[in-house]
Amino acid sequence: MTIKDLPAGKSATILKVGGDGALRQHFLDMGLIQGAEVTVIKYAPMGDPVELRIHSYELTIRLSDAEQIEVSEPYCIDNKAVENVKMNSIVKEHPGFGEGGRYHDKENENPLPDDEKLTFALVGNQNCGKTTLFNVLTGSNQHIGNFPGVTVDRKDGVIKGYPDTLITDLPGIYSMSPYSSEEIVTREFLLMDKPKGIINILDATNIERNLYLSMQLMELGIPMVIALNMMDEVRVNGGSVRINAIEELLGVPVIPISAAKGEGIEELVSHAIHVAKYQEKPQISDFCSKDSAVHRCIHGIMSLISDHADKAGYPERFAASKVVEGDSLVLKHLELEQNEKEMIEHIIVQMEEECGMDRASAIADMRFAYIEDVCKNTVVKPRESKERIRSQKIDKLLTGKYTGIPMFIAIMGLVFYLTFNVIGAALSNVLDILITFVTNGVDNLLTAMNVNSVLHALIIDGIFYGVGSVLSFLPIIVTLFFFLSILEDSGYMARVAFIMDKLLRKLGLSGRSIVPMLIGFGCSVPGVMASRTLSSERDRRMTVLLTPFMSCSAKVPIYAFFSAAFFPHYAALVMIGMYFIGIIVGIIMAFIFKKTLFKGEPVPFVMELPNYRMPGAKNVVHLLWEKAKDFLQKAFSIIFIATILIWFMQNFDIRLNVVADSRQSILAVLAGMITPLFKPLGFGDWRLVTAILTGVMAKESVVSTISILFGSTIEMVSVISAAGAMSFLVFCLLYTPCVAAIASVKKELGGKWAAYVVVIQCVVAWIAALITYIIAGIL
């Protein structure tokens, strides 16, 4: 019997974990080990994947992977006897950073020079409050989300009040195994950059799972403190942790904190500075029983690889553990001789025979056994929190078998409706009136001052009309980001990945791929970067190539401008239709990519579903301000320069003479060279072609360019039909993304793939626009 056969609500004991490779190792690291109790919570609306409860936390995996895990006969967890461990409730006051010899290794401390910078790595599981702590420590305002893997790149900052420090916020990981790109980034930083100290943040509501990573970090021999985050939630729900006792068992300082409330931060910083300054390494790195087969195996291998580990820059204990697990990256860097490999293999096989487990399972079991002992003696588990109970009730509706998909469609439909037809549209109209009022005022002032006609035209027709036409759409963009931020911060984005995994798998993608693509509706740049959370290079590349097909917010001004001019009675419908066209084309391209560039199976789906929570007002406001500021910077930098340049090229010929007819201008000559390519699409006017070219710099420039070149919508309507306008919209939706997005693709995948994106999207856009023009002409 396997997990796949377990009904929802039933529990069983894991007997064997099948499979092989990095995925199996990842399962072991996540706690799916022999002897562990697993409970099936629910199946996704489409029947796949399945949500499990293991070691007091929730995990989702696919049925094809669940089929690899053999379990005992099912039972109801309520009927199983559970030992209720009670402990002394007297809690001693936690000592300060300079007190208590057992909390700091005084004997082996090795003080650094006073002028040496103290570098720290901030490491922890995904969604444990790491970025919140980073913001508190540094005073930064990095985006905080309620989705596993928000941090996809390292971020640096200086700890407030300590100018000679540098702390790096690393991507969230579950172990030091190289399963995903985030884990590789974090591991390489710790092993190669060698920070002076580690601040390991743990989710106190789930210490058991979080300590698995802590044990691997302690093997590195880097000075370390543990920040036990969310202790306020533990106390509220009746739980507690004997801090002094857990410090003795782990051999590193443990500080209870609440990053969200700023509690315990000063003490955490004091301990971190102290261990880094005096280079006090963890006092414990051996977590197996002295007489166990695993202990003999690891120490036997340590003696064999000592020289190789020193040469590769790896701590012996860490390297030995990874050799037993079969970590290919570590084995490659150790450069072992063939006879050494054979001796090591003999030692490991002997250990497997004595343990009755395979090598990777034995190491994972050793760690979890130690963790279980630590938690049994130091932790009183909190009762099920109100947040968890509330999340379960909400999930019955939002991830229910018959309600999950309809609710997703309804929620996204409501987001687009409110953005384009109610809130965003209303605010955009108000701002447009204000911009028009200011423009008319400046126009009258310049006229009264009898300013030179050329300069007058530049200021009004170029700058105010060009930049102002783009600024009026700022409310729509901010409104869209507001709703996307609410969905992410609340935890719903993770549910969307859970709901859509089976459907996306048919397209050759993982459910996690939907999150970068949903982010792409806001902006392609963070959407492309978010693909780093995917462990498979195949899935990652495919997701990066598909994300720009999702209509980013920078294209909203184009849709709104053309909809108001050509389809005033159906403006909202046309704008929403653009999003659906992008999705449909993305699906078609996914099928094509699956059969050509990206053959094979998508990455396995392994993810946590966080509790729902109320989005933090500060976080939402900060995100909106960042997006608005980014838009305004574009408006007054790229778009400002582009409008002046376009105005100049429209009003002067190649001899720099002022032209009476813009068809004789520099712009007309340049655009005229490629205009024939667009005539079959219904918009063969050089001014529209020019707008497309400027849109490569920033999509918002399309509207400002058209506003300058045509002067009025009446003129534009006279040279292009409604069918041509629809064709133009489809082309703008699908053609090459902006320079910033292309640069992000180049950064993630390299120049070759960035060139592919430009070429593929231009070809697809031309074909789609032609089909649109033909169909619209018939209708």
Regions found by a protein language model. Give the residues of each.
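Conserved C-terminal guanine-recognition region of P-loop GTPase G domains, centered on the G4
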Residues: Y162, R187-P253, I558
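Alpha-helical transmembrane helix bundles of large polytopic membrane transport and channel proteins
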Residues: V225, R235-P382
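Extended, low-charge hydrophobic alpha-helical regions
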Residues: E354, S361-A362, K381, V422-I463, ...
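Core alpha-helical transmembrane segments of integral membrane proteins
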Residues: L398-F498
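Hydrophobic core segments of alpha-helical transmembrane domains in multi-pass membrane transport
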Residues: M407-L418, L480-S485, S563-A565, M578-I592, ...
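Transmembrane helix-loop junctions at the membrane interface of multipass transporters and ion channels
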Residues: S553-I576, A740-G750, I771-L779
